[in-house]
From Swiss-Prot:
Protein name, per record: Holliday junction branch migration complex subunit RuvA
Function: The RuvA-RuvB-RuvC complex processes Holliday junction (HJ) DNA during genetic recombination and DNA repair, while the RuvA-RuvB complex plays an important role in the rescue of blocked DNA replication forks via replication fork reversal (RFR). RuvA specifically binds to HJ cruciform DNA, conferring on it an open structure. The RuvB hexamer acts as an ATP-dependent pump, pulling dsDNA into and through the RuvAB complex. HJ branch migration allows RuvC to scan DNA until it finds its consensus sequence, where it cleaves and resolves the cruciform DNA.
Region (Domain II): 64-142
SUPFAM superfamilies: DNA helicase RuvA subunit, C-terminal domain, Nucleic acid-binding proteins, RuvA domain 2-like
CDD domains: UBA_RuvA_C
GO biological process: DNA recombination; DNA repair
Domain of life according to the entry: Bacteria
Localization per record: Cytoplasm
Region of interest (Flexible linker), ranges: 143-153
Name of the gene this protein is made from: ruvA
Main location: cytoplasm
Natural source organism: Brevibacillus brevis (strain 47 / JCM 6285 / NBRC 100599)
Ranges where the record places region Domain I: 1-63
Length: 205
């Protein structure tokens, strides 16, 4: 069992990053690969979940042990597979997800990709007791740290702009969409969502 991978971040994609260590490149599927764009070419460490299918052996990577643990708990929910778990963690911070489960907020959970009312209710039923003892401050991701809501919005905006810069967009192009993305980040949109919105705005010119 591989518990974590530490090495040089060789490159990243919309679904995964590749970490090279010992002459081997490990492909790690992540909730939001672009959060690691600032580490490209540098040493980094991700905690992993090893998933075996009939047709593939896959590694999933997470910034913290707590995020990985939450992913594994999501996999215990009937109807949620690895892709669904990643989509949920990409759309919300662990803090937001745990709070939604603890507060039995079905409306919030149904905003996640592929999550209907029945699945949202199942998430609450299956995870509420398992998340007793989890506190928001204990499960924040590395990107969020112990930041206030305002600081988290700024952090998400900066990471999204960094990712768009890495994709080849100029400062002038990004300046035109900065205010729009800033407002979206203040509304609670995460890094991946901001990147997608930014790309849509840039393609429209």
């Amino acid at each position: 069992m591989i518990d974590f991978v530490e090495g040089t971040l060789s490159y990243l994609d919309s679904e995964y990053i590749v970490i090279e260590t010992g002459g081997i490149g490990y492909r790690l599927f992540c909730p939001n690969p672009y959060q690691f764009v600032r580490y490209e070419g540098n040493k980094t460490k991700l905690f992993t979940h090893h998933h075996v299918r009939e047709d593939a052996i896959l590694l999933y990577g997470f910034a913290t042990r707590d995020e990985r643990d939450l992913f594994r708990k999501l996999l215990d929910v009937s109807g949620i597979g690895p892709k669904g778990g990643l989509a949920i963690l990409a759309a919300a911070t662990p803090e937001q997800l745990v709070m939604a489960v603890q507060q039995e907020n079905v409306t919030y959970l149904t905003k996640f990709p592929g999550i209907g009312k029945k699945t949202a209710q199942r998430i609450i039923l299956d995870l509420k007791d398992k998340l007793v003892g989890y506190t928001p401050s204990a499960i924040l991701t590395v990107a969020a740290g112990d930041l206030t809501a305002g600081e988290q919005a700024v952090s998400a905006l900066n990471e999204a702009l960094d990712a768009l810069t890495a994709l080849g967009y100029s400062d002038g192009e990004l300046q035109k969409i900065r205010n729009t993305l800033s407002e979206k980040s203040k509304e609670g949109d995460g890094v991946e969502k901001l990147i997608k919105q930014g790309l849509a705005l840039l393609m429209r010119g």
